Amino acid sequence: MRIDTSALCDIYSDQVDVVEPIFSSFGGVSSFYGKITTVKCFESNGLIASVLEEEGQGRVLLIDGGGAVRRALIDTELAQLALDNGWEGIIVYGAVRQLDVLETLDIGIHALAPIPVGADDNEIGEVDTPVNFGGVTFFPEDYVYADLTGIILSPELLDLAELEE
């Protein structure tokens, strides 16, 4: 289903938080939504890989990389792992790489910027902890909705049937 964050903001204005417009879309899917799983890490993607090995249907991985864009936290290998395990999308408060391939994969990916340098693979960080960036606090189990216009957050699953009316 295509997500329209503008329409969701109009319908659910009192139930959503809007993330500051600092993200760009780098995946092959322009809109996605799901229940948040968070990873907090810095220039290391080993923990990200561990989480992406889990079943991801209905889930979006939200990565707090501290806003650092010196090393890419997501590359084609991790994006393919996410796709293989059914993840709906990935949002990275940090960088990604290998855009030529990322944009062909059937998964939503939003991040701050691209850079060719990869992250190390240490499993350092935290999983399912509240993270704050873009002017909002993301709690595990919240729902995130993303499209080319922006990213919004809700503590509850929104009724997307409202978009079809």
From Swiss-Prot:
The keyword Cytoplasm is annotated on this UniProt entry: yes
Listed Gene3D superfamilies: Ribonuclease E inhibitor RraA/RraA-like
Keywords: Cytoplasm
GO CC annotations on file: cytoplasm
Intracellular or extracellular location(s): Cytoplasm
Quaternary structure, from the entry: Homotrimer. Binds to both RNA-binding sites in the C-terminal region of Rne and to RhlB.
Family: Belongs to the RraA family.
Annotated protein name in UniProt: Regulator of ribonuclease activity A
Organism: Actinobacillus pleuropneumoniae serotype 7 (strain AP76)
Higher taxonomy: Bacteria, Pseudomonadati, Pseudomonadota, Gammaproteobacteria, Pasteurellales
